[in-house]
Amino acid sequence: MEEGKNWIVVPTWRVPGRMERWHSLVKHLKYRTKDLEEVRYVPHHKVGWAWWTCSRVIFPLEGESHLEIQAYWNLTPEKGWLSSHSVRLTWYTEKFWTDVTPDCADSLIHSTYFSCFTAGEVRRAIRGEKLLSCCNYPQAHKAQVPSLQYLALVVVQQNGRPQRKGAARKQWRRDHWRGLRVARQDYRSLKQGGSEPSAPRAHFPGVAKVLGILA
């Protein structure tokens, strides 16, 4: 009797298109800006026996926990789904693991990586002083109920930069997408074999935004 197939079912998030944008952004933030210096990036040729895995990105978090973003490809070749990818988002410790949503993944990453407003910024904003810190991961706050202090600091951060009159909002949008732009530029430079000087620390657009996840 012929043995049937053994299926492994895990929750995944489908990603339209290819994964170069995600890989380029991770490598840019790990090797150039050093924002993700402690993150472990495992490309497909180093994964080993898991041939369906395109890459693994492991974020060490606080308290000996980790967040892993594992990208899959060639999931159902018998149905012709060769050009599609998906990702699995897993939070785990030594004795426990669970799958998380992109919003939760953003919050976990922001709790360890990328700076946010410090406690003293509210007092500085009230006194009309220049803010000494800013939030480089605004997408991580999207799923949360924002406090009045956070909303006020966001407004100060957007409008308090030295910009021409009426250009502050447009500049904020440019900064929000800068992470994607530098990722594309970094990917092109790697393909051409060139090298560029280190770029300044960039805002992180968020896991769902970068991957283009379709819920």
Curated annotation (Swiss-Prot):
Processed in virion by the viral protease. Highly phosphorylated on serine and threonine residues. InterPro entries: Vif. It is a peripheral membrane protein. It holds the Pfam family Vif. It is found in: Host cytoplasm; Host cell membrane; Virion. Induction: Expressed late during infection in a Rev-dependent manner. Its main location: host cell. The modification Phosphothreonine is found at residue 98. Keywords: AIDS, Host cell membrane, Host cytoplasm, Host membrane, Host-virus interaction, Membrane, Phosphoprotein, Ubl conjugation, Ubl conjugation pathway, Virion. A motif (BC-box-like motif) lies at residues 147-156. A motif (HCCH motif) lies at residues 110-141. Required for replication in 'nonpermissive' cells, including primary T-cells, macrophages and certain T-cell lines, but is dispensable for replication in 'permissive' cell lines, such as 293T cells. In nonpermissive cells, Vif-defective viruses can produce virions, but they fail to complete reverse transcription and cannot successfully infect new cells. Homomultimer; in vitro and presumably in vivo. Interacts with viral Pr55Gag precursor and human APOBEC3G. The interaction between Vif and APOBEC3G is species-specific, which may play a role in restricting the replication of HIV to humans. Forms an E3 ligase complex by interacting with human CUL5 and elongin BC complex (ELOB and ELOC). The BC-like-box motif mediates the interaction with elongin BC complex. The HCCH motif (H-x(5)-C-x(18)-C-x(5)-H) mediates the interaction with CUL5. This is Virion infectivity factor.
